Regions:
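Terminal leader/tail segments of proteins
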Residues: 1-70
């Protein structure tokens, strides 16, 4: 398992200032951790959002989806 910060590539902000992280598991699953809560998951190339969240967390989810869904 590796944990790294979600970079802001598609979002207009320069950074998410350490509030959004990606957990990359060895089996290929990835999870988005926003404010210490798992809010999205990628399995087999598809992103699943695990609920509705604040505007900022929604930005994290959109960025995560644009970067990792194929």
């Amino acid at each position: 398992m590796k944990i790294f910060e979600l970079p802001a590539i598609y979002d207009s902000r320069k950074s998410f200032y350490g509030k959004a992280h990606i957990i990359d598991y060895e089996n290929g699953t990835m999870e988005l951790l926003s404010y210490n809560t798992i809010v999205s998951r990628v399995v087999n190339g598809k992103v699943k959002h695990l609920g509705k969240w604040s505007a900022t967390t929604s930005r994290h989810q959109k960025e995560f989806q644009k970067q990792f869904e194929y």
